[in-house]
Amino acid sequence: MKAVLLVSGGMDSLVATALAHHHGFELAAMHVNYGQRTWQKELECFRQICDHYGIEKRLEIDAGFLGAIGGSSLTDAAIPVGPADLAGTDIPTSYVPFRNANFLSMAVSWSEVIGANRIYIGAVEEDSSGYPDCRKVFYDAFNQVIEHGTRPETSIEIVTPLIDMSKAEIVKRGMELDAPFHFSWSCYKSEGKACGVCDSCARRLRAFASVGIADPVEYEVRPDYLQ
């Protein structure tokens, strides 16, 4: 069975890739450049992850229109990337409006063409920044969209293997699968050393610290987010 992987180059998509590989799928990987601040580093990590898992079928998509639409600190230089707020409940400025729906639509199109039956995405609901398009209900609904919007003979299902996991659990599972975390990038701000203070860096650092494992990525600062 063939699976399309949405691989950003981040920690979650890496572990989702490791799981799909572990389950024996024939893998095809998609990466989307949507004008994000760290697009070059993320693309580099995508290629390294694909090389590591021997994924030859790859699709790199330019979705710069999401950057042109704006509305997110990830794509708009005029909107600063705020510091981590791990206890916050508001949707942060890093939310890219309806981004994952756009990604999934492209993945479904490609899956129909190449005959893939599964789409893996490393979405996390329980221990995330509160993005509305990272909720299980969203993916359940999108599976209905696929069913009603593709050919009758098409059978494609979105798989979200990490959706109910904490970031610490994701790190543990990745270590069990020998996932190459050094090929992943989570920082929202920097392509050199990870900043260590954005929300994504904070959640990653806290996860690694929670399981007592050193994050192999180099940081400008490594605050203690377990306090």
Swiss-Prot record:
Transmembrane stretches, start-end: none
InterPro entries linked: QueC, Rossmann-like_a/b/a_fold
Note accompanying the cofactor annotation: Binds 1 zinc ion per subunit.
Enzyme class: ligase
SUPFAM superfamilies: Adenine nucleotide alpha hydrolases-like
Organism listed in the record: Chlorobaculum parvum (strain DSM 263 / NCIMB 8327) (Chlorobium vibrioforme subsp. thiosulfatophilum)
Name of the protein this chain belongs to: 7-cyano-7-deazaguanine synthase
Gene name of the record: queC
KW tRNA processing (keyword) present: no
UniProt entry keywords in alphabetical sequence: ATP-binding, Ligase, Metal-binding, Nucleotide-binding, Queuosine biosynthesis, Zinc
Residues reported to bind ATP: V7, S8, G9, G10, M11, D12, S13, L14, V15, A16, T17
Family: Belongs to the QueC family.
HAMAP family, sorted: QueC
